[in-house]
Amino acid sequence: PPGLPPLLDKHFMGLCGDFIHRHHEHTGHLPGAERLTRFLGGISVPLFTKLKARGIPGFAALEDYPYAEVREWAQAHLNDL
């Protein structure tokens, strides 16, 4: 199979914006890089059930990418918020 396109080509807020907004509404704070990585990788945790994360655009959008690579990408973008 062909290689995955670089994460640099991905639009952070396009993939995570709705999740970040819903997470902030529910918890009162922004999600961290680990939580965003789980969302983008399609890894369910109990909070995601409450947030109905599977129905949020972007859920599992980066599931084919290595976890550590997605976490670094998410952390870099969180630092810019």
Predicted regions and their residues:
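Accessory DNA-binding and partner-docking regions appended to nucleic-acid-acting proteins
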Residues: 1-81
